[in-house]
């Protein structure tokens, strides 16, 4: 039901009325906002932004707002402010972030490859389907990481083309929410197996697992469509670089759907699954007693899951909402570089998920014996 609601909202936000990009013009040929994905702000050459005159140093007159006109054809060559230029050329963006991505690639790529190899050799299907999909999502993410590493090491200069930029952006964000939803599905599966063993025993596990994973992938795909539909690649005149997703054209201004899109993404893609996971593991630990051999393993799995959500998912989703709220209401992008750092930490989940599989595989072995005992009793 949660994933179905998630998909419905995604479809609503992707409808023609809410997903058009670019600008509309009123009778005075003044730009009016439509939907676009917001990052750093960049202005086309020979254009002006809307700003209060009181912001000009030394201005003592009455406060007014200057209405500006955007070019009818959107320009791919942009100018950015000094703060954005400082971030794009800083060691944080060109050294620290790619160093973390290199670490994630070096650990996550072989770890998820080994996990997939072990899963394909496993004949049991109780948990294999969920973990296979989780490992595939992480593996795809690791495959695209070298492109982002090269991008940052090259001074945030993207050389792989618009299509590849959109594809890596979709996979980058899609991996996070696909992982979150699959971890929630795994926790529900374990909850039913331990807290409601008789109900779990009568379920068509393979069918439910395949349908659930298919719904997760479909939901995430629908929600990621705006990143693939809208332009992500822009050339920055001052620095002579081409950015990927990090800068957008200010003439593609935001609409209320912009804010609602990201709020719904964080709410249905992070908060609700996180609450479901907390409830499921709490109920499991409460049901099992300390003498049960599975109890300690579930404590470890719960702690690891909590670490994954706290370090990898919580910061980026919280900052995501704050950033886009500031962008919509105050037209500022000061938090975006903080959000990029949080996203960088979020990539660590691709390294931690394989260890969660190894923990849960131990639990599954004990659960198999437990269900056999229940069946014979």
UniProtKB/Swiss-Prot annotation:
PANTHER family: G-PROTEIN COUPLED RECEPTOR, PROTEINASE-ACTIVATED RECEPTOR 3. CDD domains: 7tmA_PAR3. This is Proteinase-activated receptor 3. It is a multi-pass membrane protein. Residues 121-127, 189-205, 280-296, 361-377 are cytoplasmic. The gene is F2RL2. The lineage of its organism: Eukaryota, Metazoa, Chordata, Craniata, Vertebrata. Residues 39-94, 148-166, 230-259, 322-335 are extracellular. Glycans are attached at residue 82. The record marks 38-39 as: Cleavage.
